């Protein structure tokens, strides 16, 4: 029977659609009594089953179906040094970052405006994968994926304890604490 003929039958009020439904057998009180008797007899079996932890018996499952991400589980790290001559080579840098490789990008061979465009492009890709970026030198940059931690040891070497006396005098003048703002005192007294 097609959909259109069924719709016509419903609109016309024909009762032959009632034959399309199956008759359901409802449980009687006898069925419930048999169920309750079986429940009382099997209550000790149910108690032992409910006390057992279903998560203890994992021997039937394979040890692990998880596949690690490339570059994270291996101890081999790769650093790529790239010296592009044009912006057209920048997608290779992004691909290396996606493969979890650290990239040192030497842009001294490019024109300054193209180099700026390249750095912006790769910095955006690095940001998209939660990576890190550092400027190493003039037109030389380090881009690393999120699985690599980048630390800057230059800041440790340039600390005030490692500098000469001239540097210490300069730094002590520059790092003197700033005076409190005038509005800070009135707010503090008001509280």
UniProtKB/Swiss-Prot annotation:
Gene3D superfamilies: SepF-like protein. It comes from the Bacteria. GO terms for cellular component: cytoplasm. Cell division protein that is part of the divisome complex and is recruited early to the Z-ring. Probably stimulates Z-ring formation, perhaps through the cross-linking of FtsZ protofilaments. Its function overlaps with FtsA. This is Cell division protein SepF. Its main location: cytoplasm. Residues 156-191 are annotated as: Disordered. Belongs to the SepF family. The keyword Cytoplasm applies. Homodimer. Interacts with FtsZ. InterPro entries: Cell_div_SepF, Cell_div_SepF/SepF-rel, SepF-like_sf. The lineage of its organism: Bacteria, Bacillati, Cyanobacteriota, Cyanophyceae, Synechococcales. GO terms for biological process: division septum assembly; FtsZ-dependent cytokinesis. Keywords: Cell cycle, Cell division, Cytoplasm, Septation. Residues 156-167 have a biased composition (Polar residues). The gene is sepF. It is found in: Cytoplasm.
């Amino acid at each position: 029977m097609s959909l259109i003929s069924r719709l016509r039958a419903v609109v016309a009020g024909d009762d032959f659609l009632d034959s399309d439904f199956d008759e359901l057998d409802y449980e009687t009180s006898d069925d419930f009594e048999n169920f309750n008797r079986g429940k009382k007899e099997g209550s000790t079996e149910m108690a032992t089953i409910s006390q057992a932890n279903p998560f203890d018996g994992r021997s039937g499952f394979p040890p692990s179906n998880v596949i690690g991400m490339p570059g994270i589980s291996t101890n081999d790290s790769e650093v790529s040094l790239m010296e592009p001559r044009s912006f057209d080579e920048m997608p290779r840098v992004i691909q290396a970052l996606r493969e979890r490789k650290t990239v040192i990008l030497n842009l001294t061979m490019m024109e300054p405006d193209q180099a700026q465009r390249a750095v912006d492009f790769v910095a955006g890709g690095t940001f998209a994968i939660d990576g890190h970026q550092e400027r190493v030198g003039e037109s030389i940059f380090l881009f690393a994926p999120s699985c690599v931690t980048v630390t800057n040891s230059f800041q440790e070497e340039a600390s005030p304890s490692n500098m000469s006396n001239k540097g210490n005098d300069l730094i002590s003048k520059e790092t003197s604490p700033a005076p409190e703002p005038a509005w800070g005192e009135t707010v503090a007294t008001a509280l």
